[in-house]
């Protein structure tokens, strides 16, 4: 038995809700973005992203699973030939929801749900370089030797990744100089305290 969804049901019956989500997903894949109520957009988001995941697989079984929900053959073709390959390097997060305010008349909150853009070559190179140098991506996935080598190759090929690597080196250099200066000051202060204590003990 399927787990019931919390909150009010869209439409009136379960069958009406399934048809409503299928039609909204078809319109989303056909036009790239639609404007609807905020409640429908939030319910549509996981529904549509699951269909995009099937499209990324690209096999016959995945196509048949999608055609259970999307009945328009042209939209299914677009989903498997254009939308699915677009997100080959993105693990989830294929849509975004933008709130638009309330609608005149019934004051219902409106929102626009749309497909996000694909990752560019520069963004992929920057992501690989950041994983290799162990910054904000290191908590999620630590780079292997192959990933580090690939990031270095991408940095040599991509000017964006090279700029990121240069900026990282510039940020690390002042930190090392500051630590060296602090260590020198600490040692000098220790020597002065020793010199001050020495004569006092000899007088006593």
From Swiss-Prot:
Compositionally biased spans, kind Basic and acidic residues: 128-142
Alphabetized UniProt keyword annotations: Ribonucleoprotein, Ribosomal protein
A GO term, aspect molecular function: structural constituent of ribosome
The keyword Ribonucleoprotein is assigned to this record: yes
Disulfide bonds: none
InterPro entries referenced in this protein's UniProt entry, alphabetically: Ribosomal_bL17, Ribosomal_bL17_CS, Ribosomal_bL17_sf
Region feature Disordered, mapped onto this chain: 124-204
GO CC, alphabetical: cytosolic large ribosomal subunit
UniProt cross-references to PANTHER family, sorted A to Z: LARGE RIBOSOMAL SUBUNIT PROTEIN BL17M, RIBOSOMAL PROTEIN L17
Subunit-structure text: Part of the 50S ribosomal subunit. Contacts protein L32.
Protein name: Large ribosomal subunit protein bL17
Organism the protein comes from: Frankia alni (strain DSM 45986 / CECT 9034 / ACN14a)
